[in-house]
Curated annotation (Swiss-Prot):
Stored InterPro entries: KH_dom, KH_dom-like_a/b, KH_dom_type_2, KH_sf_prok-type, Ribosomal_S3_C_sf, Ribosomal_uS3_bac-typ, Ribosomal_uS3_C, Ribosomal_uS3_CS
Cellular component GO terms, alphabetical: cytosolic small ribosomal subunit
Assembly with partners or alone: Part of the 30S ribosomal subunit. Forms a tight complex with proteins S10 and S14.
Protein known as: Small ribosomal subunit protein uS3
Species the sequence originates in: Wigglesworthia glossinidia brevipalpis
KH type-2 domain location: 39-107
Biological process (GO), any one: translation
Source species, domain of life: Bacteria
């Protein structure tokens, strides 16, 4: 059987960049790597309701800079910047170096694979029918300009005794084209019947030259103070 490689990993260095962009010598590398992991786990718990898509970590001159991509920057910043100040202090305690935090707003969360997959997972946990959640995600993405999208859920769908897969796809999703801007992510829905896996793959178009897939985002630097025909497939 043919197997699919992770669409994000295979495009690293071609049209996608790494989520940690820093260099270190042999002695410091393991320390920085563990520090990055702790920071990501801390932010994942602290910002669980802020619709965070990704975290980019940089380490310039004995400090750490974190760019948070979120659909709700107000939740991250907090009232008068109080929450972001707390995050900055906690991250400084974890890493042992001064921390800077910048926030990038995601204008169209319907085109972000991580946010879409988490949204579908949360709907499944609230007992919303999986077909309705999948169709809504597909239609919203196409309506906002996606060239193609594929959504797959697998597990005990609808409480069935036998686990199975179902997926919907609309438009093109060219996984073999390296210049294709493919956004891929997964999430898990913890239901009373068990875990249901959610996979989302979104094709936003082809990147030529120095075009950026995040061209319409707005950055914040907080200070201290149609309904179309959809393909369906079922596999037991």
């Amino acid at each position: 059987m043919g197997q699919k490689v992770n669409p994000n990993g295979i495009r690293l260095g071609i049209i996608k960049s790494w989520s940690s962009t820093w260099y270190a010598n042999t002695k410091e590398f393991s320390k920085n790597l563990i520090s990055d992991f702790k920071v990501r786990e801390f932010l994942k718990k602290s910002l669980s309701k802020a619709y965070v898509s990704k975290l980019i970590i940089e380490r310039p001159a004995k400090s750490i800079r974190i760019n948070i991509y979120t659909a709700r920057p107000g939740i991250v910043i907090g009232r008068k910047g109080e929450d972001v100040d707390k995050l900055r202090k906690e991250i400084s305690n974890i890493t042992g170096v001064p921390a800077q935090i910048s926030i990038t707003e995601i204008k169209r969360p319907e085109l972000d694979a991580k946010l879409v997959s988490e949204n579908i997972a949360s709907q499944l946990e609230r007992r919303i029918m999986f077909r309705r959640a999948m169709k809504r995600a597909v239609q919203n993405a196409i309506r906002l300009g996606a060239k193609g999208i594929k959504v797959e859920v697998s597990g005990r769908l609808g409480g069935a005794e036998i686990a199975r897969k179902e997926w919907y796809r609309e438009g093109r999703v060219p996984l073999h084209t390296f210049r294709a801007d493919i956004d891929y992510n997964t999430s898990e829905a913890h239901t009373t019947y068990g875990i249901i896996g959610v996979k989302v793959t979104i094709f936003k178009g082809e990147i030529l030259g120095n075009s950026s897939p995040y061209i319409n985002e707005k950055k914040y630097m907080p200070t201290k103070k149609g309904n179309k025909k959809i393909r369906k497939y079922t596999k037991e």
